[in-house]
């Protein structure tokens, strides 16, 4: 079985690994990964890697399960020898609001979810309500190299190649194509639901910051209010979500907005040294596109599994989506097996 995965962000690499781990013991797989960007130049490398879905219920109820599966998978690795290389760690902190809001659907997934006390709220005088919980961080700059190493150990080949069409890959001999091209998926097949959600972050040295602080303002929308997420070596400052903006250059205006708002939220950051600044595009869609489809090119056909449109929560949902993609791959194998069986003469 010849399999080509297009895309080498967290979705592409994790999907490739999940499928290879599950099916290579029972079905010889010749797997290749094509991408024009590999770590450290993917959107996943820009992400702080904090596990937290959006606050609102997803349109597709399956996404709740995929988020849960990802958290459980990562939590099972938290004390493993691989945790450090994966960039995986526990982190506690705050979600802050101007006024009371309903509890999120993931309140029973994270650890120790509770409402903030009046004394805790005194620490954040600009906010009137909040939550505290323990979650996970999974830093893409570590996790993607770890996934890549696991795949190469299994004999998966990675190629720096820009794919122009599914037909090009199909005519190259692929039996199954797995489309994990993120925000660029529309270049392979029109998808009017897919848009870039531009984000910009500042990375600082602030080792005294131990807790995440995420603020939320419904008037501004998701990711447009300040957030602070400590990592293993640096702290990520953010607060930009610009739908439809394809500008990949860092913006001075956005830099100033992020810096001022984060320093107001946590005044000690004024003393932090800025060590990096990055811009990336979240693949925004009304819901994740995770489905299989057969495409025909003349007399030939190829099976395609689409897995893209994860917005700003790709690392939060990636393993659950990889497991579902593997389920779809298993159905393709079963269908191909049945199609090869001789017809019954009973």
From Swiss-Prot:
D-serine binds at residues 223, 227, 282, 312. It is found in: Peroxisome matrix; Cytoplasm, Cytosol; Presynaptic active zone; Secreted. D-proline binds at residues 227, 282, 312. Phosphorylated in the cerebellum; probably not by PRKACA, PRKCA or PRKCE. May be S-nitrosylated, which partially inactivates the enzyme. Its main location: other. Its EC number is 1.4.3.3. One of its GO terms (molecular function) is D-amino-acid oxidase activity. GO terms for biological process: D-alanine catabolic process; D-serine catabolic process; digestion; dopamine biosynthetic process; neutrophil-mediated killing of gram-negative bacterium; proline catabolic process. D-dopa binds at residues 52, 282, 312. Residues 1-16 are annotated as: Required for protein stability. PROSITE patterns: DAO (PS00677). It catalyses: a D-alpha-amino acid + O2 + H2O = a 2-oxocarboxylate + H2O2 + NH4(+); D-alanine + O2 + H2O = pyruvate + H2O2 + NH4(+); D-cysteine + O2 + H2O = 2-oxo-3-sulfanylpropanoate + H2O2 + NH4(+); D-dopa + O2 + H2O = 3-(3,4-dihydroxyphenyl)pyruvate + H2O2 + NH4(+). Residues 215-227 are annotated as: Active site lid that may open upon substrate/product migration in and out of the active site and close to increase the hydrophobicity of the active site, to make the hydride transfer reaction more efficient. FAD binds at residues 8-11, 36-37, 42-44, 48-49, 162-163, 181, 282, 311-312, 314-316. Catalyzes the oxidative deamination of D-amino acids with broad substrate specificity. Required to catabolize D-amino acids synthesized endogenously, of gastrointestinal bacterial origin or obtained from the diet, and to use these as nutrients. Regulates the level of D-amino acid neurotransmitters in the brain, such as D-serine, a co-agonist of N-methyl D-aspartate (NMDA) receptors, and may modulate synaptic transmission. Catalyzes the first step of the racemization of D-DOPA to L-DOPA, for possible use in an alternative dopamine biosynthesis pathway. PANTHER family: D-AMINO ACID OXIDASE (PTHR11530), D-AMINO-ACID OXIDASE (PTHR11530:SF15). Interacts with BSN (via coiled region); the interaction is direct and inhibits DAO enzyme activity. This is D-amino-acid oxidase.
């Amino acid at each position: 079985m010849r399999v080509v995965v297009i895309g080498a962000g967290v979705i592409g690499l994790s999907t490739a690994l999940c499928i290879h781990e599950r099916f290579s013991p029972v079905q010889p797989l010749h797997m290749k990964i094509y991408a024009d960007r590999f770590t450290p130049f993917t959107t996943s490398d820009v992400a702080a890697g904090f596990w937290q879905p959006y606050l609102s219920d997803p349109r597709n109820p399956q996404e709740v399960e995929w988020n849960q599966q990802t958290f459980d998978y990562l939590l099972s690795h938290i004390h493993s020898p691989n945790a450090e290389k994966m960039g995986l760690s526990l982190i506690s902190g705050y979600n802050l609001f101007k006024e009371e809001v309903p509890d999120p659907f993931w309140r029973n997934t994270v650890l120790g979810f509770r409402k903030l006390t009046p004394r805790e709220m005194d620490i954040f005088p600009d906010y009137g309500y909040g939550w505290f919980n323990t979650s996970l961080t999974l830093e893409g700059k570590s996790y993607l190299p770890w996934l890549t190493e696991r795949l190469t150990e299994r004999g998966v080949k990675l190629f720096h190649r820009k794919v122009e069409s599914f037909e090009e890959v199909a005519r190259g001999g692929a039996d199954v194509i797995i489309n994990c091209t993120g925000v660029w998926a529309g270049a392979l097949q029109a998808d009017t639901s897919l848009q870039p959600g531009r984000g910009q972050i500042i990375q600082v040295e602030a080792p005294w910051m131990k807790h995440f602080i995420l603020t939320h303002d419904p008037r501004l929308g998701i990711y447009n209010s300040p957030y602070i997420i400590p990592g293993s070596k640096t702290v990520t400052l953010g607060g930009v979500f610009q739908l439809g903006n394809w500008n990949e250059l860092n913006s001075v205006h956005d830099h100033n907005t992020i810096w001022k708002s984060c320093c107001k939220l946590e005044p000690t950051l004024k003393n932090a040294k800025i060590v990096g600044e990055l811009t990336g595009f979240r693949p925004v869609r009304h819901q994740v596109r995770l489905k299989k489809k057969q495409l025909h090119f003349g007399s030939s056909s190829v099976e395609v599994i689409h897995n893209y449109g994860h917005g700003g929560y790709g690392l939060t949902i990636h393993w659950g989506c990889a497991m579902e993609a593997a389920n779809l791959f298993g159905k393709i194998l079963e269908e191909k097996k049945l199609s090869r069986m001789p017809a019954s003469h009973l």
